[in-house]
Amino acid sequence: MDYSLETTAEDPWVRISDCIKNLFSPIMSENHNHVPLQPDAPLGEEDGMRGHPDGAAAKLDTTGGGPKAYKQAGGSTVKKGPPVAPKPAWFRQSLKGLRNRVPDSRREMAASCQPTPTSRERPGPPLRASSSIKQRISSFETFSSAHPPDRGAQRLSLQASSSSGEAAELPRKQEGERASGPSGQGAPPTMEQQRPEPEQLPPASPATSEASNPGVSGHPPLEQQPGQKTLSSDPDPLSRLLATQMEGPRGPVVKMPSQRARSFPLSRTQSCEMKPLDEKTSKLYSISSQVSSAVMKSLLCLPSSLSFGQIPCSPKEGVLPPTAFSEDPTNSSAEASASDTSFSLNLSELREYTEGLSESTEANDCDHCTSQPGQSVISLLSTEELKKLIEEVKVLDEATLKQLDSIHVTILHKEEGAGLGFSLAGGADLENKVITVHRVFPNGLASQEGTIQKGNEVLSINGKSLKGATHNDALAILRQAREPRQAVIVTRRPTLEATTDLNSSTDSSGSASVTSDVSIESAEATVCTVTLEKTSAGLGFSLEGGKGSLHGDKPLTVNRIFKGLASEQSDTVQPGDEIVHLAGTAMQGLTRFEAWNIIKALPDGPVTIVLRRKSLQSKGTPAAGDP
């Protein structure tokens, strides 16, 4: 075609438009269709040349004659040059720069795009789109970074305009911010902060839970995006936020264990000081739980090697025979395990030692010989705990001091996860309100040590008092004692003196008084032999008591006699009679369930039973025809 008729002076522009057509991609050609700029702005002219290679559309975008120009471009078969004046030399130089280095044009575009929003004068949809783009660009330059916010910024730009060129322009502006001069609003510090940001902020990822969705527009969500690897150029508020987030990676990792570590010592010190128990329970529970807690806390503070080696060597300790504590380092593992089983002491010995210690710390050599288990426990306690213990002992009255003779502190050394060797019975929610030892397992630690017996009242386990605890709570405390390598159990043996003295201070006098009554009346009991006829209904009476009953270990006795029993049999068997032998089988030490199994296994016919009948009936037991 001949271009010389109309565009002889415009031939360079035709060639320039061809260059522009080759240089720019379709995305760049569609990039600024919705962004009207001033005709004197170089970027607007450049954008017009980009968007329309024929040159006519660039002029008509600024003058508002778009429909007419497009009709000319589509209807004519001859390309016409734009009806504009020749462009200055600097514009051609910029085009040459575009050929040589394409990223520089992007930087100039980002730099020249900043002052353009102030020169907009045309209303309408393009103006609204351009104003929204300006807000997005300013917020993008202020708060965004290279990786995740690109998606959120592209979503924001796509909501404002459907042009794909606007979504592609935002990452290019981010690249142009590094080379932008004074026209870039805080771009250099932003990019400087974005460099170390991927290394600093990923540990602060816990803050992402507080950040909102990145697709929501507005400044508050963008201010919360520093947790999502974003950072602001404003150094005052967000630098402090960054400082708190930099402490964040160690905060959550260290904070949670520290909270747990704080909770356990607080619970131990509370049980050691016994402030709640001093108000609600007796002084006896206070002193026993204090000793248990202090000893357990001291054992946990010792290393495992020292706790296994130091404790058995410091005693000569109490209940176990002296052969169990061999100090020969070449002893066998069996002897070492025997030495690690346990040791026990009486609180009365500990009281005597603390009284002597309050007068003179190095005196009382005779006590050193007689109460070596007490010394081993005292050596475990810190000075503060020992002072508290001495103060508690001084406050106790004589009646309470006598009760210390029946209280024993047992320290069991075991493996992690191993049981203590006994079970519990009773609870505040059961008929028997007192927590007692239900059963001592034959091969357990408690059986090997020998201090803990069936029927003993359990005052505390590892510093946790069982006063007023329900049965499930007591079992939970017993299960928790499996984890440590040591266990401290404070028990009390019911005695005759303890039953009368503890009646006012504790609620456990019931089981102790019953046991003491049995011991007194057993001396005055008479033994008799009777023969009963066993039928399909049994022997005609029910049983109560037995090993591991609700009231502790008690002998098997006749509870009540069923109706329909022969008169001669009802006279021979009375409620409260203790069954000693049944068909040649000893009934001592059996549970009620085991005794019933023996009775059920008997064939029908005559059965010989040896009974022990008390001449003085217990309180509350009817005397049905004493002989």
UniProtKB/Swiss-Prot annotation:
InterPro entries: IL-16, IL-16-like, PDZ, PDZ_sf. Residues 38-270, 319-341 are annotated as: Disordered. Residues 129-145, 206-215, 328-341 have a biased composition (Polar residues). GO terms for molecular function: cytokine activity. Residues 169-178 have a biased composition (Basic and acidic residues). Residues 402-498 are annotated as: Interaction with PPP1R12A, PPP1R12B and PPP1R12C. Residues 154-168, 231-242 have a biased composition (Low complexity). Homotetramer. Pro-interleukin-16 interacts (via PDZ 2 domain) with PPP1R12A, PPP1R12B and PPP1R12C. Pro-interleukin-16 interacts with GRIN2A. Pro-interleukin-16 interacts with GABPB1. Pro-interleukin-16 interacts (via PDZ 3 domain) with HDAC3. This is Pro-interleukin-16. It comes from Bos taurus (Bovine). The gene is IL16.
